[in-house]
Structures are given as C-alpha cells and as structure tokens.
C-alpha cells in the first residue's frame, strides 16, 4: 500500500493525540506485585471491553464543550469559538483581573473582583469559579475556605471544569479518594478528548522557572528557542533509527518549534520514516486501504513497539484488551499499557486508571486510580494556563505570571505551586501579590508563599519542604520556631533530601528544636553524605565538630565552636549550592518537571 505525503502528515498529527502529549508529574516509582495483578478481574469475559477506550477514537467536541468558560479568549483575540455559556460581564471582569495584575493596579483589581462577584451572584458558573479562587487566596476579599468551596461547588455543578479540578485536588489532599476519583475520571476523559483538537503546541510542557532558590536560566533559554544542542542530539538519535526521535523531529519542523523555521518537506521526511504506528492504525480502522486487516495492524504496532514508540505498545494493549484480531487477554494488555505508561503515553495512564478504578486486570485501588487520572487530567485544555504564565514571565510581566500560576496552583499543579511560591519569595513587592486590602503585606506574602510551598511539598517537591523549614529556622517572614523547622526538615528528609538530613544533624548537635544527641547528629550527617556525595566538604567539617564535642566537652575548644554561629550559615550555603533540586532533562531539551520514566517492576 502506498500512502501519500499528505496522509502521512495527517497520521502524524493524529498520533499526536496518542503519543506526544506526555504526562508531566512528580517523579514516582510504581512497583506492581502479583497481588495487584491477580486480585483484579482477569477473566477475559468478565468485563465489557466497550467500557474501555479504543485507538484514539472519540466523538469530536468543540473547546466550549470541553472547557466552558475557557480563559483562552482573553489571551488569543483571534479565538473563533463563541463561549455562549459565559456572560460578557464574566470575560470583562476576568480581563480586568489580569490587566490589574500586570499593571499592579489595586483600584482596577477591586473593580474587576466586584464585576466578577456581580456576575457570580447572577448565576454565572464561570464567574463563581473565579470567586472561588478569589476567596481561596484572599484577593480583595477576606480569605474564606468555606466560601471558596461553596463557589467551586456551584461552578462545578454548572459545568466549569477548572472548579472540578480544584475540588478534586481538595478531595485528594484529604485522602477522600472515593470523591476525588469520580471527578478526576471525568476530567481525564475530557483531557483525552481534547488531545485531538488542541490548539497548543504539542511540545508545550509545564516549565519549572526555578532550580532551588535560583532562576532556571537553562530552561528559560530553551523556552525562548535559544538552545539547539539538545536538538542536535535528538537529530543524531533520529539518524541512528530511533523512531521516537524521528517523530519529534518531524513535529519540530511541522510546527516550527524550538526556534526552527517551518519546513513541511522535512517534516514529511521524518514522519514517513517513523510512522509504523500510524500505518497500523490505518489497517485497524480500514482507512485508506481495501479493508480492515488486524494481522497487518498488529505487525505495524509491533514494529512501532520495537522502535520504542510508546503508541505501539499502547495499541497492542488495546488489541489484547478488546480481543481485536487476537485472543482477548487482559493480563497481556496490562503489561503493554504499563510499558507505554512508563514512556509517558497519556492514554496508557488513562487505561490503567480505569483498571485500578474498576478492578479489571488490576486489584481495585482508588488511590492509584486517582493518581493516574490526575496525571492525565492535568493535560486538559486548562493546562494552557501554564503556557500563558510562562510567556508572561519571559516578557517580564511577573504580576500576570504570578496570578496565572496561582490559579493553576489551586487546580493542583505542583510545578505551578512551586513557581508561584518562588515568584513571591524572589520578587517580593514586585510580584504584584494582591491581598485583602490591596498589595499584599509582608505577612500576606509570607502566608501565601508558605501555603504554596507546603502544597508543593505534599506532592513530592522536597525543596519546598526544605524552604519551609528554613523560614521557621531563620525567622524569614515569620517568628523563629525550631520545632516547626525540625518538622519541615523531617518531611523533606522523608523525601530523601540530603540538605534536610544535614540540617537535622546540626539541630541535634546543638539541641535546637530537637534533643541534644551527638549520636543522632552523626547519623544524619552520614545519611546526608550517602544521599549526595557533593556534601563531602560540609559533612566532613560537621563530623569534625561532632568529634570535638564528644571528646572535648566542656573545654575551651567547644566554647570556640559555640561562639561561631555564622559557621552554620556558611555551611548551609555550601550544602545548598551542592544539592540543588535535580532537573530532569528531556531528550527534546525541554527542561521541565516530568516523570523520570522509572521502570515498573512487573512480576514475571
């Protein structure tokens, strides 16, 4: 069968929906036991295969149906979609909120919030969603958790998807998985449907704008298209036969990404070399060929899988789950889905979430189902907020970036939580943080940053917990509290943060917030060195201090050590410089927060 160049590009763009929208999340390792597999429904006739998705087919829906009240209309003036469900007053107020944040205009912000409040009182669910945000952060209104939840409930009942995200995240934080899983399941389904009509760049991923306490200059350079070294590496991989790299190179040329000029001829060249999976799709659906041929489809999917294309693994999983052209085998399907999920294929996460949710193929586990649904839901149309926030930040519009990241924080995005917290810490008054009566007071800024860092730490951001501990230890924005500092360091230590281990050792050595215990101090210092060899110098000095205290207690030498409180600050700086939060480099060169593609331990 000959496939035209136009068809190949169409296949490639279609497979985008199955392949290139990689799920971004905090690093995690999933270990499956035989109990996970054997506890589920493995009787191949005991479930309705129609309940599970097929090969990317979905009923076409408009963006208004998928994300009613979308903020896109504010940022893209050529938006053709008419948002009939949202009132003009809502969009007017929303536009003023963003303008006020950019300009640092508290008068305009008060006017904007009043306008949104009026629209919400008239029953507009999208205005109610914004008021939920307003009460949640205390912007021109007194902070009220109850009013925030109430507004989000009304908004969600009216169809606002962002409020459903906010409520789902609240339920998740309270371990109310029975409620969270239902909302995230709906949101994930919407996200999957949106992949086919997404107007965003397929490579747009949440970018962490900071590394530790410093700006993430490498990531920002790449976001501006100023770095091409990683592209050269990717091109080299493509030339060596890596089909995943071929597909990405094709997308770069087709969309003109990463500073490249659009070149459809080059895009076609790379797509035609990579699209085994797309050809398999044509055969399984019978598009452009004489008739459906499941044997041929399976052969192409297997070739795609052999070329490390996660969509090939995903579609093989669908064949076995559905029993299409092969004997139905849910256990075999599960294995393929896990391989695809480890490669970042979002629909594979969606299928696995359904399996954990329903108990088909895997032991029913609402916590795991919720986690996987959330990963997919965060790739929905509302994820465009991240791109607009980054664009604002790159243009120097810190106020707009801060309010957009703050909105995303409420929806449960960890990267947005840490970005917003970092902005308010780094820029202070220049963050344009708006409080109850105008610009945020020092206390309001501290409380806002503390809340954001804490949420990020709950989702696995170890540096966030460390910063909370530092704030309490040094009295930054709050009164010094060694006990709370120790609690925060303990939390960061539980996430294997070496600097937190070092700090706990210091606190035990000096009896600050923790019992004076040189044995425990040495243990924590040793753990810090085991976790990160970059800590060798500060740990060596700290261990020397412990040795002196143990062998020369009540001597002048110990008194000299105690008279040098500034030594700890210097040591902390050394440790911090050597233990900055790790950043995962995607082969594409997008310095983004993303899964480490940790291997799944699958029982044989």
Curated annotation (Swiss-Prot):
Record keyword NADP present: no
Top-level taxon: Eukaryota
Example GO BP: ERAD pathway
Region (Disordered), start-end ranges: 48-69
Pfam families: Sel1
Keywords per UniProt: Glycoprotein, Repeat, Signal
Extent of the signal sequence: 1-25
Keyword Signal: yes
UniProt family annotation: Belongs to the sel-1 family.
Function: May be involved in the endoplasmic reticulum (ER) quality control system called ER-associated degradation (ERAD).
Protein name: ERAD-associated E3 ubiquitin-protein ligase component HRD3B
Organism annotation: Arabidopsis thaliana (Mouse-ear cress)
Lineage of origin: Eukaryota, Viridiplantae, Streptophyta, Embryophyta, Tracheophyta
Gene name linked to the record: HRD3B
